[in-house]
Amino acid sequence: MLKLKMMLCVMMLPLVVVGCTSKQSVSQCVKPPPPPAWIMQPPPDWQTPLNGIISPSERG
């Protein structure tokens, strides 16, 4: 059993050493494209046209 543990330790040691010394690859941050122009415009005024179509009913 001791021989098996020793063999596992000897086999794992190079993997640990290589893992600690190797540089991890980091992907560069990609800058997102600017938003389309229509997103930057103010929202349309829908209430004014609807007020002409929909009006409160008159009380009789």
Curated annotation (Swiss-Prot):
Residues 32-44 are annotated as: Proline-rich. Pfam families: Rz1. InterPro entries: O-spanin (IPR010346). It comes from the Viruses. The keyword Disulfide bond applies. GO terms for cellular component: host cell outer membrane; host cell plasma membrane; membrane. GO terms for biological process: membrane fusion; negative regulation of proteolysis; viral release from host cell; viral release via disruption of host outer membrane. Homodimer; disulfide-linked. Interacts (via C-terminus) with the spanin inner membrane subunit (via C-terminus). Part of the spanin complex which spans the entire periplasmic space. The spanin complex is composed of one homodimer of the i-spanin linked by intermolecular disulfide bonds involving two Cys residues and one homodimer of the o-spanin covalently linked by an intermolecular disulfide bond involving one Cys. This is Spanin, outer lipoprotein subunit. It comes from Escherichia phage lambda (Bacteriophage lambda).
